[in-house]
Each structure stands twice: as C-alpha cells, then as structure tokens.
C-alpha cells in the first residue's frame, strides 16, 4: 500500500514538472566540415603518394617525409622559378600545378607512375593553399 501511495505521489510530482510549451523541434543542419589541415595533406597525400612511395624521400628533392615536407615546400622556389607552395594562391603553386597537370609544368603530372589524385584530394590541397597553407 505504501508503495502504491509513493508511486502515485511521484507521478503527480513528475506531472507538475511538465510544461505547457509546444515548441516545435528545429532542425539544426550539420556544421560545415572542418578546414583541411596540413596534417591531413601529409597523412593522405604526401605519405602514401609521394614520400613513402620512394619518389620524394631521403635524398630526392623536395623531401616530403613527415616532419620535413612543410619546410621544403612552403615559400620554396621550384626549378621552374615559382614557389612550390605559394600560400593563398594555388594557381601560383608549382605543386598544385603538377598534381592538376596544369600548363607550364616540367615533366609529367604527379604522382608520377601512379594514379592521379582524386578530385577530392586535389580539392583538399587547393583549400589548404587558399587558406594560406598553415602548418597545422
């Protein structure tokens, strides 16, 4: 009997806590994806397609190994006379021109001897450069 009385009192207390609010649920669209970081470029492009493939590691310039790639690319002049990475400007970044097979490149499209980078990966490099090529 005491249990039933306690259950009834608890039910009344819970009902008293309710509100008369009839707010509609609002759909909150997902946030935009986070910006592309240099770490993403290193882990998803340079490591599998450039450095670890043996093309740009150790003595082969520019060395794109983790810990060295950023300093070897950003604001560093290419043999073609333009910076490998010109922060803020993919069209003036030789690396971007090479991966998109743009006009004026010396040699072949990168990565050489392998499949071209996907459009998503190329877009990631473009975004990173457009953001100023931060070392994040």
What is the role of each PLM region?
Residues 1-7:
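Bacterial N-terminal signal peptides that target proteins for export
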Residues 119, 131-136:
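Flexible coil segments in periplasmic/lumen-exposed cytochrome c-class electron-transfer proteins
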Residues 10-12:
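Short, linear, compositionally biased motifs with a strong N-terminal bias
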Residues 18-35, 39-123:
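Solvent-exposed helix-loop boundary motif
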Residues 14-16:
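C-terminal motif of bacterial Sec signal peptides marking the signal peptidase cleavage site
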